[in-house]
């Protein structure tokens, strides 16, 4: 046997290589299966959460909004607007007919989500009609520095504004300014207070 291995050493090397490769493939397959399972579970939790908050906040009252978890309340209101728009044959036309308060809450929903990686991500992902409505909401609800940073990027990303240019250094500066201003700002509480103030538009 030893003599055979000496004579055909390359076969032994090949067998070892195949064994190592097989272990590697099995390990990668297990990791991929784990990721897929985790992603599927996360998606199921997300869908369950969305369904739950839509039902919970299908009907609104000041008492319900004040006593509720503010994130759930905001998400529920925004997701019900989203569900309504999805059912329309022309979403842009339906959005244009919404009360201003609903437009702004819907825009804020996307702003809060898309800006987690930076304010500029919101502008990269969205345009008219969401961005003007987000601007209105930000100017009335957010801290001054956040509103200034938002307005700066709004102008920079506006193709019709010839007085502003998209300069990467300025974008980074505004992203940082916005992030700092929002650190201690209770976004969900401010948004829910806005909904309560304009409750007739949501009922």
Language model: regions and residue ranges:
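Extended, alpha-helix-rich binding/interface surfaces that flank or overlap catalytic cores
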Residues: 31, 52-106, 112, 123, ...
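Boundary/linker elements of alpha-helical solenoid repeat scaffolds
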Residues: 113-118
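N-terminal signal-anchor transmembrane alpha helix of single-pass membrane proteins
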Residues: 1-38
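Short juxtamembrane segments adjacent to a transmembrane helix
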Residues: 30-57
